[in-house]
């Protein structure tokens, strides 16, 4: 006879661990299945942890979580052959409790999963699986382990952007047109060297990059400082990589030679490389997130690319999915599609869907208007150089030169049209 659980959680990333932990704390019997060797071994992220999301799940997470540095400074670079940028630094973010941290995913995910196991979750890794569906209802999973079938009243799918189980079962579909591919490297440096280069103490700086760094494709680069390492990466739309005939590795190598980046990683020891698909379709690309005996959480349905958020959305969706099941079990209600619709209501009432809905037009606008990643970074960089250079030319003349260069690269009607498109995207 197949072993039975209240809930099976597929995946041991941010969403999967959040769901499993919340379920166990709610008194449910939980099995968590992970394909990788260990929790975190297949998980890749820019590695920023947002405290608000994890705090709702584990309030005292700061006591023992493997946190690298807390973030107090955000820099944005608009890149051409040189670079132009701005930064925001606030000492308010340097006062505990800190709001954002850099993390190493493999370390954090293992810690998070340990918390779930301590709460009562049974986690098994290196396990392949398929959904068990009977009469249109998900009733468990079939694994490649001895015993095969494992039954449950509900299954939460938190197995990533291209959720193999959801697609195979027909709950979702592959959407490569809405996927970005991010690649990153971890560069190790002595702590004192890093702190001197970035002018930081125990706190951290994050840098986001756009422009020539992405070869005119829809995407961004990023650099985050950890305790003794730098996370450096770039992500662009999968379709753009194909169209431009450039590999992610080539783009990352080009990024490392940029004069603004090369000095920051000089002398470092690159020990880790990873790649990851990221959903960038936004609100309009969200699939059905629940059905009879199943729910989807994490990267599979949701990510907020505009504000570079991911971990907080993943954890929140996992938590809300779990809370829905805990509440239904407490009310002695079945995990039917009609009852699991409460999960979608919780999502709609949360910041997750509200933010995604607000920016629902932006992915399509950016994808169809590449000038936001080519022409405008060049224009902004030229304008900054013109204004900053002291060469005996009066400011009024310089302003005329800037206006002329703008209209030279983009017509007046084009500028007005782009401004309207951008306004429509963020209104």
From Swiss-Prot:
<keyword id="KW-0560">Oxidoreductase</keyword>
<dbReference type="Pfam" id="PF21162">
    <property type="entry name" value="ETFQO_UQ-bd"/>
</dbReference>
<keyword id="KW-0274">FAD</keyword>
<dbReference type="GO" id="GO:0016491">
    <property type="term" value="F:oxidoreductase activity"/>
</dbReference>
<dbReference type="InterPro" id="IPR036188">
    <property type="entry name" value="FAD/NAD-bd_sf"/>
</dbReference>
<dbReference type="GO" id="GO:0009399">
    <property type="term" value="P:nitrogen fixation"/>
</dbReference>
<dbReference type="InterPro" id="IPR039651">
    <property type="entry name" value="FixC-like"/>
</dbReference>
<dbReference type="Pfam" id="PF07992">
    <property type="entry name" value="Pyr_redox_2"/>
</dbReference>
<dbReference type="InterPro" id="IPR049398">
    <property type="entry name" value="ETF-QO/FixC_UQ-bd"/>
</dbReference>
<keyword id="KW-0535">Nitrogen fixation</keyword>
<comment type="function">
    <text>Could be required for the formation of a functional nitrogenase Fe protein. Probably accepts electrons from FixA/FixB and reduces a quinone.</text>
</comment>
<keyword id="KW-0285">Flavoprotein</keyword>
<comment type="similarity">
    <text>Belongs to the ETF-QO/FixC family.</text>
</comment>
<dbReference type="InterPro" id="IPR023753">
    <property type="entry name" value="FAD/NAD-binding_dom"/>
</dbReference>
<protein>
    <recommendedName>
        <fullName>Protein FixC</fullName>
    </recommendedName>
</protein>
